[in-house]
């Protein structure tokens, strides 16, 4: 396996998982996602929600909700790009499955309210990218702006995407501007 990894450097590695064929829980899939990303440095994992096909042994099995497929794709992205671990997802699992009504990053933030709001002027990059609404480019832009001056108001975030979502999870100079915009 080590030889396979060494020989594949610089090449794109992708795998695919069918979701809902068996009785697997998201918890099992997330463990596999973390393991595969850690050990095989995958470019991504593709998920496909099961859909029954007539005249096959599984034709009477109900189709899987496509939203489950999407939530698992989001988990893969959070693991691969943002450094989330299996432990990060444990508090948001319900009976071993992800909530479908909210994205995993927001669910994680809501399950970890003790970490929020964060002070945007002092939070490190790794914490900024865990804020719902803040991605890598936005985190880099925030860090760039705060090198120029302290961020004190919503006006200082002008031009940054998802500001309405971000405000719930941040403070600027100790002030929270959520519901004040």
Residue ranges and their predicted role:
Residues 1-84:
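Conserved AdoMet/S-adenosylmethionine-binding subsite of the radical SAM
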Residues 23, 150-151:
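Conserved aromatic
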Residues 35-42, 161-170:
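Structural recognition of alpha->loop->beta junctions
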Residues 55-130, 165-181:
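Long, highly charged, low-complexity intrinsically disordered interaction regions
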Residues 117-123, 128-131, 142, 151-160:
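A short amphipathic alpha-helix within small helical-bundle interaction modules
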Residues 145-146:
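Residue-level signature of tetratricopeptide-repeat
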